[in-house]
UniProtKB/Swiss-Prot annotation:
SUPFAM superfamilies: Adenine nucleotide alpha hydrolases-like, Rhodanese/Cell cycle control phosphatase, THUMP domain-like. The gene is thiI. It is found in: Cytoplasm. Pathway: Cofactor biosynthesis; thiamine diphosphate biosynthesis. It catalyses: [ThiI sulfur-carrier protein]-S-sulfanyl-L-cysteine + a uridine in tRNA + 2 reduced [2Fe-2S]-[ferredoxin] + ATP + H(+) = [ThiI sulfur-carrier protein]-L-cysteine + a 4-thiouridine in tRNA + 2 oxidized [2Fe-2S]-[ferredoxin] + AMP + diphosphate; [ThiS sulfur-carrier protein]-C-terminal Gly-Gly-AMP + S-sulfanyl-L-cysteinyl-[cysteine desulfurase] + AH2 = [ThiS sulfur-carrier protein]-C-terminal-Gly-aminoethanethioate + L-cysteinyl-[cysteine desulfurase] + A + AMP + 2 H(+). This is tRNA sulfurtransferase. Its main location: cytoplasm. Its EC number is 2.8.1.4. Gene3D superfamilies: 3.30.2130.30, HUPs, Rhodanese-like domain.
Length: 482
């Protein structure tokens, strides 16, 4: 079987040296992706296309599907390459190939020709089109918007019968641009922004700020691995996980409620910039869209950018949510994003939309930056190829209850401000306060003869924290959902 790879049009308008470099990189990317399907596969580059030849017919659909997801490819032609003698021979081969497909349909013939011949492309179109129209009674010629377009390519003494055309994702081949680090949360925005930079030719590494224990990290790892495996598996990339719970805890204790969102984003950018510098990455990528949330106003985005010299790319800055969700659906990350948790403990009640630099800096003076340095230093860096095995590990489920027994105590894990604003009172059971960001260090000090029912407003943080505690060996935890 044979496939003809057509280049993304922006590649074809580059200078000769740049075009050749892009084609060489794309050829290497195709080999890296397809070698898993057929090790004997041949990839041959030409000036205006790339040929892929494979012997294992059983892998035809898998190879075709993989090619449609490699950045830099405009479309793929699945072809049958046969010799021919003259124009009538071309017609006979076209009739054998397309007869069933054209029955009862309108059609036209389009021919591309390379080499020296006694006929022109238009003459072949007329001869083959007339012959098909004469020999297939139910078919008729229609030159504009036909049901079927018969594509033929003539090159020297070879005829390419095009059996199918399949659209690629376009863009530039990965590796033609420099590396970037995507701040991935597993939601709609970060997944789509990561894809957009891969499509533009960047090798995308991933940085995840863990606010909810191992379960959340497993979910985000699955998203990152999916994106890499589907669109970027030609290159090795890193997945860096930073335990940001200590940083969030420090912010919740030391920073004014209205400034928390901007300060948290500034801390994330500081941490990600350190990671990017460590690995020689040139830019950060975020999924921020202008005005989508309080921290994404122009004033706040500028303050967030000010904490680092690292370039921050925001490919979704002018997109609305509906457009982003549609893109997530197209690339296959919608289902991941819909089930990814949001954290009730990290949201300000009255976030500022126009933060003042002096006030933000004054709030940050109370912050212990050694905590930030420590979490970056202890960041977990893994090769994304290892994630497939790691994400298969089973996560222990935690029981959810709506009632309580005589040995049960409700543990309110919301932030202190949330608890002060809306105290939890449940008749017939004790309620103890312990903010979620202190659970990892303080839960062991509680009475372990009791069964602790974790509770938060949305029920997501409580479940994840209960799973985290179970992983630490605490079996006396459940989730309370009245």
């Amino acid at each position: 079987m044979k496939f003809i790879i057509k280049l993304f049009p922006e590649i074809t308008i580059k200078s000769q040296s740049v075009r050749l470099r892009f084609i060489k990189i794309l050829t290497g990317n195709i080999r890296n992706v397809l070698k898993h399907y057929d090790e004997t596969l041949a990839v041959v580059r030409h000036w205006d296309n790339i040929e892929v030849r494979a012997k294992d017919e059983n892998q035809r659909l898998a190879i075709r599907d993989a090619l449609t997801r490699i950045p830099g490819i405009h479309h793929i032609l699945e072809v049958e390459d046969v010799p021919f003698t003259d124009m009538h021979d071309i017609f006979e081969k076209a009739l054998a190939q397309y007869r069933e497909q054209l029955e009862g349909k309108t059609f036209c013939v389009r021919v591309k020709r390379r080499g020296k011949h006694e006929f022109s492309s238009i003459e072949v179109e007329r001869y083959v089109g007339g012959g098909l129209n004469q020999h297939i009674e139910s078919a008729r010629v229609k030159l504009t918007n036909p049901d079927v377009t018969v594509h033929l390519e003539v090159e020297d003494d070879r005829l390419l019968l095009i059996k199918g055309r399949y659209e690629g994702i376009g863009g530039f081949p990965i590796g033609t641009q420099e590396d970037v680090l995507s701040l991935i949360s597993g939601g709609f925005d970060s997944g789509v922004s990561s894809y957009m930079l891969m499509r533009r030719g960047c090798r995308v590494h991933y940085c995840f700020f863990n606010l909810g224990g191992a379960v959340h990290e497993i979910g985000v790892r699955q998203v990152a691995h999916y994106l890499w495996n589907r669109f970027g598996s030609s290159h090795r990339v890193r997945f860096v996980a930073i335990n940001f719970e200590p940083v969030v805890g420090e912010i919740l204790e030391k920073v004014d409620d209205g400034q928390m969102g901007v300060v948290l984003k500034r801390m994330m950018v500081r941490a990600a910039s350190k990671v990017a510098e460590r690995y020689g990455v040139q830019a950060l990528v975020t999924g921020e869209a202008l005005g989508q949330v309080s921290s994404q106003t122009l004033t706040n985005l500028r303050l967030i950018d000010n904490v680092s010299d690292t370039l921050i790319l925001r490919p979704l800055i002018s997109y609305d949510k509906e457009h982003i969700i549609n893109l997530a659906r197209q690339i296959g990350t919608e289902d991941f994003a819909r089930t990814m948790p949001e954290y009730c403990g990290v949201i300000s009640k009255s976030p500022t939309v126009k933060a003042i630099k002096a006030k933000i800096e004054a709030e940050e003076e109370n912050f212990d930056f050694s905590i930030l340095d420590k979490v970056v230093e202890e960041a977990n860096n893994v090769d994304i190829r290892e994630i497939a095995q790691q994400t298969q590990q089973e996560v222990v489920e935690v029981e959810t209850v709506s009632g309580f027994g005589p040995n049960d105590v409700i543990l309110d894990i919301r932030s202190v401000d949330e608890q002060d604003d809306k105290p939890l009172k449940v008749e017939g059971v004790d309620v103890v306060s312990l903010p979620f960001y202190k659970l990892s260090t303080k839960f062991g000090d509680l009475d372990q003869s009791k069964t602790w029912l974790l509770w938060c407003e949305r029920g997501v943080m409580s479940r994840l924290q209960a799973l985290y505690l179970r992983e630490q060996g605490f079996a006396n935890v459940k989730v309370y959902r009245p």
